[in-house]
């Protein structure tokens, strides 16, 4: 069995044209996301970005921005979209992966995503302090919402994503991003 990797070692690892995460010290390497994944992610990012900018409430981070969620062994996850409230923003001079979870994480499923892996990822986010997680399934045209209090919701294409107490006042019909 290979030795466990640290977040610092992950930061120094370059695997061209691949997506990487660190899960309890084990390197996870995946293929780049496909077109539909990127399209749905960007559609939501544009809407979230307009809201966050108009409200001045924090900052969005782009896909593949890593966050250190736990140490010894290290876990570094990267959401497709993340939002951090203004009062929790890391120092811009910070290098490496911030040791925190965003307040909102968005995962857009790809055809090769496994349900158990997705649930484990959501669990890691919530355990590390995320307050809201949206898992969007473009193929099934639905979204599952996970909250820090343990409640869940299932949204159909005709329903709207709601920022709840993380992004109060934000609402986006799911169908408009699919």
Indicate residue ranges for each PLM-predicted region.
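Gly/Pro/Ser/Thr-rich low-complexity, intrinsically disordered segments predominantly at protein N-termini
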Residues: 1-178
